[in-house]
Amino acid sequence: GPIIQESSKIALKSKITTKQSLNLIKQLRKDSNQTSFVIMCYLNTVQKYGIKKFISNIKGIVDGIILVDLPFEEEAETKKLLDKNNIHLIKLISPMTDRIRSKLLLKEAKGFVYYISATGITGSNKLDYSEINKNVSSLKKLTKTPVLVGFGIKSKKDALAISKKTNADGIIIGSALIQKYFDAKMNFNKYITILRKFINEVKI
C-alpha cells in the first residue's frame, strides 16, 4: 500500500542496507529476548543478499519470515533451509485462495497463518467481518496453527471488532504503525511515545 511504499522510499533514500536492517533486528532481539520476531520482506532482497547468507544471519534472531512474493510452488529449497535453521516460513492466505490451495498451504504452516482480510492493498479501509469470520473458521478446521488476521486493521475499534466478531487467534498491524511515524513528523522520540500509546490501545 501507499504507506509502506512511502516508508520504503525513505529507507532507500537514506541508503539503509539489508545488513544494517538485520543488525538492528539483532540488537532489538538482545533488548527483548522474550519477544517473538517475524520479518516481512520481498524475495529479491533475500536473493540479492544471498539466500543461505541471509538465513544464516537471521538464525537465532527471528522466529519467522514472511516472503510475500515467494510462490508456494517454488518455496521448497528456501523452506528446507529455513526449517533447518528453526525459522518458520509464514503462509499467506487470502479470500481468493481456493480450498484446495488452502489445504496445501496449511499442511506446511508453522508459527501462524497470515489471513489477508481483504483483497487490495495494505492499509485499506472497509472490512467485512462476517466474511472474515466465515473464512477464518474454515481455515481453523483445517489446521491447529493459529490464524491471525491482517490488512485494514488500524484502530482499537478494528481490533475489537476482529476479536468479537471473528474466530481469529490474533491480529496483525503494519501500515497503521508506520503511519504513526508520519503522524509524528518523522521525529523518532515523538514516534515512540505515539506508538506505545497506540499499541496499548489495540491490545485486547
Name each model feature, range by range.
Residues 86-123:
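Histidine/lysine/aspartate-rich catalytic loop segments that bind and position anionic ligands
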Residues 37-41, 65-67, 89-93, 113-115, ...:
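Hydrophobic faces of well-ordered beta-strands that scaffold small-molecule active sites
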Residues 1-6, 12-26, 46-52, 67-84, ...:
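Active-site-adjacent beta->alpha loops and helix N-cap segments on the catalytic face
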Residues 97-108, 149, 153-171:
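Catalytic cores of alpha/beta
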Residues 171, 177-186, 192-199, 203-204:
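Catalytic cores of soluble, metal-dependent hydrolases
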